[in-house]
Amino acid sequence: MRLRNGTFLTVLLFGLCGLISLSWYTAFSNSKGNVVDIYQREFLALRDRLHSAEQENLKRSKELNLVLDEIKRAIAEKQALRDINRTWSSLSDETKLKLWNVTSSKNVLQLPSIFHHLPHLLAKESSLQPAVHIGQGRTGVSIVLGVPSVKREVHSYLTDTLSSLMTELSPAEKEDCVIVVFIAETDQQYANSVADNLKRLFPGEIQSGLLEIISPSVHFYPDFSHLKESFGDPKERVRWRTKQNLDYCFLMMYAQTKGNYYVQLEDDIVARPNYFTTMKNFALQQPSEEWMILEFSQLGFIGKMFKSLDLPLIVEFMLMFYKDKPIDWLLDHIMWVKVCNPEKDAKHCDRQKANLRIRFKPSLFQHVGTHSSLAGKIQKLKDKDFGKQTLHKGHANPLAEVTTSLKTYQHFTLEKAYLGEDFFWAFTPVAGDFIRIRFFTPVRVERYFFRSGNIEHPGDKLFNTTVEVLPFDNIQSEKEALKEGREKTPKYQRTEDGFIRIGKFENGIAEGEVDASFGPLEALRLSVLTDSPVWVILSEIFIKKAE
């Protein structure tokens, strides 16, 4: 019995050992299988990555081959272009234009371009690139001043002109302006000598971006030998005026992207003080954007301001007729086309053109040259409005609506006086009459100045007339400015309709500072308190904005 039990235990022990051994073996086998699977997956992933890298390498290799082919093609095309240019130069301008029309576009419609008017420009790639190009490429300014300059036989006025223009600019104005000198000569040696002289005289202005110097390519101008004589002008004068038209076109094309306004000048002028801000504000104060030319001199093409947006139209019109008429006639024709009705008379046409061409007085630029750019011509042109004692004085005032109860005499309106174009003239004022200036947006005003009467009618003054303001924030201004000191005594008198009296006319003039505590003003008013024995002239209005 005992033996049987021992045998049973032995068998049981061996069975357990076998079972444990089998479990260990199974576990070991499974563990080994998992490791193999992991390595197998990693090798497969590595193979995929290597394959992807190989494909990417092939792609890059193809791209590099394409780039190399493009470089080879460009070199070949450049060589072919040289050969084509040699052939092209032997073709007539008419043939060149026809070929350009065929090859320039796949469109059915052929768009007009500068090459239709100047087909010779197709002969050289550099024909529209400046030969001399000095400057910082400043853009985004308010005004670009264009100064074309040509070689004169006797005397050059260019450096004196530039000195005058720059001297009359304030530091802030110099940051808001570009002066472009266009040396309108294809003689490269002469152009370089002028440019070098300007670099020596005005290094700071060039470095700052205020002054730029350009000259045309030797291939820019067409052959002038076949021009037709017209309007009684000899061939040399026809050539001179034709080239001058192209000079203006080149300068305008260069300047049009640099600023908001472009002013055409000449190289033999002097400028009045404050000319830049006067021009800028006169342009901004125009009641309409319909104007095309603002004139700051009555002479020729001096001091003519254009909107930069209008320059492409003007250039294209000039290019169409550059051989036919001088620039001043062409500008008049543009305005005729825009506003004149052929069924109306000449007076109606003149009235319509007057809305496009607006004159500022007094003139801001004076012509000083006596030796014309046309060889042998002596001209003693002077602007009679420059430096002349005028019957009014204009200022750049804040944008506003001006109204009055006074009866205006003829065309001497209050609006013209406020814009600085003329004086205001009205019949005899009576008590209760007013002149009101209502600002389009509230304005902080530092000081005011009103002058009545002028040199021809010194007695036509305002008498017993007060200056009144209407603050935008009436409640706050009353708290801060209407009371003075601890006794709270009135500092200013308030009218029934809310205006505050701050000054009055004495000997025909009212001037003074505006209390800063008033804040922005909504309006300013001149109020007549008693009947006047005479008519009234308002010859100067100046509302100075606070900085």
Curated annotation (Swiss-Prot):
The keyword Oxidoreductase does not apply. It is an enzyme of class 2 (transferase). N-glycosylated. GO terms for molecular function: acetylglucosaminyltransferase activity; alpha-1,3-mannosylglycoprotein 4-beta-N-acetylglucosaminyltransferase activity; metal ion binding. Keywords: Coiled coil, Glycoprotein, Glycosyltransferase, Golgi apparatus, Membrane, Metal-binding, Signal-anchor, Transferase, Transmembrane, Transmembrane helix. One of its GO terms (biological process) is protein glycosylation. The chain crosses the membrane at residues 8-28. It comes from the Eukaryota. Residues 29-547 are lumenal. Residues 36-83 form a coiled coil. Glycans are attached at N85, N101, N464. GO terms for cellular component: endoplasmic reticulum; endoplasmic reticulum-Golgi intermediate compartment; Golgi membrane; Golgi stack. Its cofactor is a divalent metal cation. It catalyses: N(4)-{beta-D-GlcNAc-(1->2)-alpha-D-Man-(1->3)-[beta-D-GlcNAc-(1->2)-alpha-D-Man-(1->6)]-beta-D-Man-(1->4)-beta-D-GlcNAc-(1->4)-beta-D-GlcNAc}-L-asparaginyl-[protein] + UDP-N-acetyl-alpha-D-glucosamine = N(4)-{beta-D-GlcNAc-(1->2)-[beta-D-GlcNAc-(1->4)]-alpha-D-Man-(1->3)-[beta-D-GlcNAc-(1->2)-alpha-D-Man-(1->6)]-beta-D-Man-(1->4)-beta-D-GlcNAc-(1->4)-beta-D-GlcNAc}-L-asparaginyl-[protein] + UDP + H(+); an N(4)-{beta-D-GlcNAc-(1->2)-alpha-D-Man-(1->3)-[alpha-D-Man-(1->6)]-beta-D-Man-(1->4)-beta-D-GlcNAc-(1->4)-beta-D-GlcNAc}-L-asparaginyl-[protein] + UDP-N-acetyl-alpha-D-glucosamine = an N(4)-{beta-D-GlcNAc-(1->2)-[beta-D-GlcNAc-(1->4)]-alpha-D-Man-(1->3)-[alpha-D-Man-(1->6)]-beta-D-Man-(1->4)-beta-D-GlcNAc-(1->4)-beta-D-GlcNAc}-L-asparaginyl-[protein] + UDP + H(+); an N(4)-{beta-D-GlcNAc-(1->2)-alpha-D-Man-(1->3)-[beta-D-GlcNAc-(1->2)-[beta-D-GlcNAc-(1->6)]-alpha-D-Man-(1->6)]-beta-D-Man-(1->4)-beta-D-GlcNAc-(1->4)-beta-D-GlcNAc}-L-asparaginyl-[protein] + UDP-N-acetyl-alpha-D-glucosamine = an N(4)-{beta-D-GlcNAc-(1->2)-[beta-D-GlcNAc-(1->4)]-alpha-D-Man-(1->3)-[beta-D-GlcNAc-(1->2)-[beta-D-GlcNAc-(1->6)]-alpha-D-Man-(1->6)]-beta-D-Man-(1->4)-beta-D-GlcNAc-(1->4)-beta-D-GlcNAc}-L-asparaginyl-[protein] + UDP + H(+); an N(4)-{beta-D-GlcNAc-(1->2)-alpha-D-Man-(1->3)-[beta-D-GlcNAc-(1->2)-alpha-D-Man-(1->6)]-beta-D-Man-(1->4)-beta-D-GlcNAc-(1->4)-[alpha-L-Fuc-(1->6)]-beta-D-GlcNAc}-L-asparaginyl-[protein] + UDP-N-acetyl-alpha-D-glucosamine = N(4)-{beta-D-GlcNAc-(1->2)-[beta-D-GlcNAc-(1->4)]-alpha-D-Man-(1->3)-[beta-D-GlcNAc-(1->2)-alpha-D-Man-(1->6)]-beta-D-Man-(1->4)-beta-D-GlcNAc-(1->4)-[alpha-L-Fuc-(1->6)]-beta-D-GlcNAc}-asparaginyl-[protein] + UDP + H(+). It is found in: Golgi apparatus membrane. It is a single-pass type II membrane protein. Its EC number is 2.4.1.145. Pathway: Protein modification; protein glycosylation. Residues 1-7 are cytoplasmic. Belongs to the glycosyltransferase 54 family. Glycosyltransferase that catalyze the transfer of GlcNAc from UDP-GlcNAc to the GlcNAcbeta1-2Manalpha1-3 arm of the core structure of N-linked glycans through a beta1-4 linkage and participates in the production of tri- and tetra-antennary N-linked sugar chains. Prefers complex-type N-glycans over hybrid-types. Has lower affinities for donors or acceptors than MGAT4A, suggesting that, under physiological conditions, it is not the main contributor in N-glycan biosynthesis. This is Alpha-1,3-mannosyl-glycoprotein 4-beta-N-acetylglucosaminyltransferase B. It comes from Danio rerio. The lineage of its organism: Eukaryota, Metazoa, Chordata, Craniata, Vertebrata.
